[in-house]
Amino acid sequence: MRIKCYLLGGGTNGYLVWDEQSREAMFIDPGAYAQAIADDIRKENLTLSLIVLTHGHGDHIGGVPQLRAAFRDAKLAAGADEAPLLADVDRNLSRDICGEAVAPVPDLLLKDGDTLTLGALCFRVLDTPGHTPGGISLYTEAIDDGLFEDDEYTGTLFPGDTLFHGSIGRTDFPGGDFEALKNSVRAKYYTLPDDTVVLPGHMGGTTIGLEKTQNPFVRP
């Protein structure tokens, strides 16, 4: 597995993830700069099959229309419970964040336990509400061999804005729920192996083990 992180508008992290053998790829949370993302996908000779949204806020969806136009065969996937927020340009904050209304309609509505595949790679969908009502995360037992050359890590989690290095996502936006977020972290993240790499929607990476011992907002 290979992963390329993009620093997008508003300090959002977007991730291009692909299987090295098949060259099949997905992009997680294209918040902006869709043209630059598309150029990189073509430069790497990748086939973009999936665009995945961890949640529906404008800083994570702003580039969706342009990226879908550039790769018409790519399927847009989001949590099934996130569809109402995606459709509501006031609640998804796209006007405030993107300067225009963005309301993408997913092709695939994902639920807890669903799986997504890229070549030989398999990603498990985790329902992780709290930051938004229908937020999801992706977990895979694969790691990026180029970034992590030893055997220290055994999996990768993409939590969107639910969990950060030493922090958690905001719950004061429409549909946010602090108790639901804490439950998502404890039930879905803290049950993963401690050596799972966490690549969040903002700020730098961390591990599950580090957050379990040092995150002041959610203790196991």
Stretch-by-stretch model annotation:
Residues 1-44, 137-158:
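Conserved beta-strand hairpin/beta-sheet module of binuclear metal-dependent hydrolase folds
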Residues 16-22, 85-86, 92, 162-164:
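Short, basic/glycine-rich phosphate-binding loops at helix/coil junctions
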Residues 26, 52, 76, 156-158, ...:
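Residue-level marker for buried hydrophobic side chains located in beta-strands
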Residues 26-28, 50-52, 125-127:
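Short catalytic-loop micro-motif centered on adjacent basic/acidic residues
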Residues 30, 55, 80, 161-162, ...:
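Short secondary-structure boundary segments
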Residues 33-117, 121, 141-148, 213-217:
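Active-site HxH/HxHxD metal-binding segment of metal-dependent hydrolases
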Residues 91-92, 122-220:
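Metallo-beta-lactamase
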